[in-house]
Amino acid sequence: METNSNNFGELQELKDMATLAKLLARAPFLESQYYFRNRAVDSFRKFENDAAVMIQSWFRGCQVRAYMRHLNRVVTIIQKWWRSYLGRKFYQLVVEAAYYTMKMNLYNEMAVRIQRRWRGFRIRKYCFNYYYLKEYLRAVSETNDAIREALEEFAEMKEREERKVLLEREEKQKDYQARKMHYLLSTKQISGIYNSPFREHPDPWELRLQKAKPLGHQKYTAEKGKTSQSPSNWLACTSVHSFPQSESLPPISRKRCQGPFRDINEVLEQRYKPLEPTLRVAEPINHLRLAREAFKQEERMRNVQDKMFLPFSSYHKKEKYIPMIHSSSAYNSDSYGQKHFRSQDSKKWISDKDFQTVLPSFQLFSKYGKLYSKAGEIV
């Protein structure tokens, strides 16, 4: 077995050597063939490369365009589904908002209806009750009538009291005048001025003078002299409410209180003496404003009208200025109302004499010493 394997190995080596010898013999031919083949291939290599590049670019372009179409188709589908989802979601929101709005409108309408019914019931029952208002107005009218009647009665009573007071005052004045004119009373020798023989009945003043008592002048002057020293003269300057006003009472004859007391007149004079402010206190605080107002008032008194240039202003161009008849004429202002109040036309005079001013005589003075009753008798 070992011999066979060795023989096979030798044969194989021989074959390899024979093959190598053949290849070595054909080496120059292979080189020339390789050269010519590569030279022929180089002449077509650029054309084939350009063709291959063109084929590859076209193929790749087809692939890219197909992929872009696929992407566009897929993106369109995705956008369609997404937009439909957003549309459905927005539509659901709109529908929900519309539903809530419809419910709120319905609820508001129902609430308004309920409030209207309730407010109407409440107003009719508590605020504007027709029967209650009718009764109230009837009571008010009755109260007004009663108050009006009471006021009318009170006004009549006040009027009667005022008339009574006026009559009493007039009677007192007449009595006082009669006491003052008591010396005009008729005597046995000389008749008074109120006793005329030409009258059927005597003058009422004659009877009043007879009933009146003469006024005591000496006593009055003495009382007046006494009162001049009293605090009434300096109390006259005080206000009405500063010292109590009361009717005069008769003096009380009593002794002066013992002790170091001042005279009551002196005390009252010191208490109720008028205020004597200084110049600073007497001057008002708003004297500037008062001075301005006084100055404006003087200016208004001087001016004939507030708008001085009213007839010549452009604002009143459309209005026609109408001058006064008595203060304007063709040339000069008329003197009527300024110098005289009677028209003078010498051509219409009947005579050259002016009007004669004659005053009527007093009948009472003209009858002095002529028409009196004899011996003071009342006719």
Curated annotation (Swiss-Prot):
Keyword rRNA processing recorded: no
Compartment(s) where it occurs, according to its Swiss-Prot or TrEMBL record: Cytoplasm
Tissue: Strongly expressed in adult testis but weakly expressed in the spleen and thymus. Strongly expressed in round and elongating spermatids, and weakly or not expressed in spermatozoa.
UniProt keyword list: Calmodulin-binding, Cytoplasm, Repeat
Xref: SMART domains: IQ
Residue ranges annotated for the IQ domain, each copy included: 48-77, 71-100, 107-136
Domain of life of the native organism: Eukaryota
Pfam families: IQ
Cytoplasm listed as a keyword: yes
GO cellular component: cytoplasm
Gene Ontology MF: a single term: calmodulin binding
Protein name in the entry: Spermatogenesis-associated protein 17
